[in-house]
Amino acid sequence: MTFAHQILQGVTWHARQIPTRHEFHYPYRFWAVNLTQLADNPLPKVNMVASDVPKWLPQWLKKWLKKSLQQSLTIPLLSQHHWALYQFHQADYFAINRLDASLDNRLNASLGQPAPSASLLVKAQQTWQQLTGSQPTGEVVALVVLRNMGWYFSPVNFYIGFDANHQPSHFLAEVSNTPWNKRHYYGFLLTGEKTLYQHDKGFHVSPFNPINQQYHWRVEVHPKRYASANDNPEQNGFDVVIDIGLTDSRGKVFNAGVSLTGVQLDEASVMMSIKRRPCMSATSLLRIYWQAFKLYVLKRVPYQAYNQRLPQ
C-alpha cells in the first residue's frame, strides 16, 4: 500500500512574545507529492472549462473567462510537465545556487554532483544521508508549494520519510529567507507519529530575530486511509501538525506552525482548492511584507542585520 498524492489544507500561525506581542493566522495549503511513486503515478493534469468558472467571480470576469475558454477550449489548472496555474516544477526545489554559505560543504558537494538531472527524491535522500546519517527505507512525501502562474515562492517546504512499515522516520525542512533569497536545510529523525526535537538555529530567516537562538520542533504525522475508488486501490494518507518554537536568553521569543488536513489529490479536490485560493504565492508574499511593516513601523520591533547576534 502506498501514500496517495494529497492536498494538505488548513491554517498557518505566527505568535511573537518578545520584544512585543504580535499574532496572526491565515489559511494555508501544501501539495503533498509522493516522490517515490511519482514516476509511475504522476500528478493528474487538471483543466478548467467554461462550466467550471466559479459563480462568485465578478460578472465581467466570468464573461471574459467564459469567452476565453470557448475560444481556447481549456485553461490548465494543474500540471507536472507544462505551464499551468499551478505547476509542479522540480527545479524549484533544492536550488544549489541559493544554498546558504553556512550549510555543510559536504551537502553542497553531494547535491551539486547530480544536479540538475537527479530527481527530487534522490536529492532528498542525499540530504538526509548527510544531515542524519541515514535514509528512509520506505516512501518519501514532499510537502511543497507549487509554482503559481509561472512564479515560485515558498518560505518553507517539508519532506517526510517513512520506514518500510509506513511509519514516519525522517524529517527535512527546506527553509528560505525571503529578504536575502537564500536556502538552508534542517534534517532530523522522527520517532513515530509525534516527535519533539531541538537544536541551535543555523540560518538567519527573519530580520527581527538574531541568529543565536534555539529551535524547538513538534512534528505530528497522523496516518489515515483513503478508500478505493474508480478501480484504484486503497491508499495511505495523513494529516500533519508542524510547530516551531524559538527561544534565546530572554525566554520564549516566537512560535509558528501549520495544522493541515489531507484530502486525496484528484480533479475534484484540485478544482475546489484552487477556487478557494487561486493565487496563494502572491498572497503569502504580500502577507509577509504586511506583517513585517506592522512589526517594524507600527510596533517598533528593532531590525536585526544578517547573522546579527543577541548581546549576552
Q: Where do the language-model regions lie?
A:
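Mature, function-bearing regions of proteins
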Residues: 1-312
